C-alpha cells in the first residue's frame, strides 16, 4: 500500500508541474494559436483488472491543435503528450474514424508489461509531403482499459508548385517522434526508454546516462537495435536525466527522459 501511495504522490506532483509549466512545441507553419479548445475525448472506463493500481488512468499533458494550415513545401510536426499508469502507448490514425472504431482500434505497438510504472510519453506525427486535401490526424492513447484521443485537421496549401502527396525530395534531419518525458517505476524493475526517429538517411542513435556520459553496452544498460534504452533492475542511483541523440549527415535531434526509481516499501 505504501508503495502505491509513493507512486501516486509522485504522479500527482508531476501532473501538477506539467500543468503549470510552459511547454514549447516545435515550430510548425501557421499554427492556429487562437484555438484554446480542449479537443480531447475520453472513452468510457471499463471495469479495472486486479493489478498494482486500483484503476487505470490516462490524461493528456499536451493535446495537439484542432487545426493547422500547411504552407507550400513546409514539413509539419503534430505533437501529442500524455501521462498514465503502466506504460501508455500512442498511435496515430490518418483519416476520419467514428468514436466506436477509435475505441476498438487495435494498437500497432506491443504493450510493455509494467504494472507498477507511471509514464509520461510524447509522440509526434510528421507530414513531409504536400497535402491534396484537408485531412484528419488523430492521436490515440491507451493504457489498460483506458483510451483517450484528440484530432487535428490539417488544411493543404492554398496554392502549391509541388506535386501533392509526393514526399519532399532530399535528405531530412532527424526528428525524434516517440519518447518518454518521465518514467517512474519501482526499484528492481526493468524499464525500456523509447527513442524512435524519423530521418533520411537513417539516423545513428546514442544515449547519455544520468552523469551525461555516453552509455556503453553492459549487463544493466543496453541500447537496442530500434534505438530504445533498456535499463535492467533499476536502482536509486539510476535516478536522473537520460538523453537520446539522433544524428545523420543533415543534423541532429535530442530528447530527454527523467527516470525516477521508487522505493518498494513491501520488500
UniProtKB/Swiss-Prot annotation:
Disulfide bonds join 80-139, 195-244. GO terms for biological process: axon guidance; dendrite self-avoidance; determination of adult lifespan; homophilic cell adhesion via plasma membrane adhesion molecules; negative regulation of insulin receptor signaling pathway; negative regulation of lipid storage; positive regulation of entry into reproductive diapause; positive regulation of insulin receptor signaling pathway. It holds the Pfam family I-set. Induction: By 20-hydroxyecdysone. GO terms for cellular component: axon; extracellular space; plasma membrane. InterPro entries: Ig-like_dom, Ig-like_dom_sf, Ig-like_fold, Ig_I-set, Ig_sub, Ig_sub2, Neural/epithelial_adhesion. It is found in: Secreted, Extracellular space. Residues 1-25 form the signal peptide. Detected in several sites including the ventral neuroectoderm, the tracheal pits, the pharynx and esophagus, and specific neuronal cell bodies, where it is primarily expressed. Residues 48-149, 174-260 form the Ig-like C2-type domain. GO terms for molecular function: cell-cell adhesion mediator activity; insulin binding. Keywords: Cell adhesion, Developmental protein, Disulfide bond, Immunoglobulin domain, Repeat, Secreted, Signal. Essential developmental role during embryogenesis, in particular the normal development of the nervous system. May be involved in some aspect of cell adhesion. This is Neural/ectodermal development factor IMP-L2. The gene is ImpL2.
Amino acid at each position: 500500500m505504501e508503495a502505491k501511495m509513493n507512486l501516486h504522490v509522485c504522479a500527482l506532483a508531476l501532473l501538477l508541474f506539467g500543468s503549470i509549466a510552459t511547454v514549447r512545441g516545435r515550430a510548425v507553419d501557421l499554427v492556429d494559436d487562437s484555438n484554446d479548445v480542449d479537443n480531447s475525448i475520453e472513452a468510457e472506463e471499463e471495469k479495472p483488472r486486479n493489478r498494482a493500481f486500483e484503476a487505470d488512468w490516462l490524461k493528456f499533458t499536451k493535446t495537439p491543435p484542432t487545426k493547422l494550415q500547411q504552407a507550400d513545401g513546409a514539413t509539419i510536426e503534430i505533437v501529442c503528450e500524455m501521462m498514465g499508469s503502466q506504460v501508455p502507448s500512442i498511435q496515430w490514425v490518418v483519416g476520419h474514424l467514428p468514436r466506436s472504431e477509435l475505441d476498438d482500434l487495435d494498437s500497432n505497438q506491443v504493450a510493455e508489461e509494467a504494472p507498477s510504472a507511471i509514464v509520461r510519453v510524447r509522440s509526434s506525427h510528421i507530414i513531409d509531403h504536400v497535402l491534396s486535401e484537408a485531412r484528419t490526424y488523430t492521436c490515440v492513447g491507451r493504457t489498460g482499459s483506458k483510451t483517450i484521443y484528440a484530432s487535428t485537421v490539417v488544411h493543404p496549401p492554398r496554392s502549391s508548385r509541388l506535386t501533392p502527396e509526393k514526399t519532399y525530395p532530399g535528405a531530412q534531419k532527424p526528428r525524434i517522434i516517440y519518447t518518454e518525458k518521465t518514467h517512474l517505476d519501482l526499484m528492481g524493475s526493468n524499464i525500456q526508454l523509447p527513442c524512435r526517429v524519423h530521418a533520411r538517411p537513417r539516423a545513428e542513435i546514442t544515449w547519455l546516462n544520468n552523469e551525461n556520459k555516453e552509455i556503453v553496452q553492459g549487463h544493466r544498460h543496453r541500447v537496442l537495435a530500434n534505438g530504445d534504452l533498456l535499463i535492467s533492475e533499476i536502482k536509486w542511483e539510476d535516478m536522473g536525466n537520460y538523453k537520446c541523440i539522433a544524428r545523420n549527415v543533415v543534423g541532429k535531434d535530442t530528447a530527454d527522459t527523467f527516470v525516477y526509481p521508487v522505493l518498494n516499501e513491501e520488500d
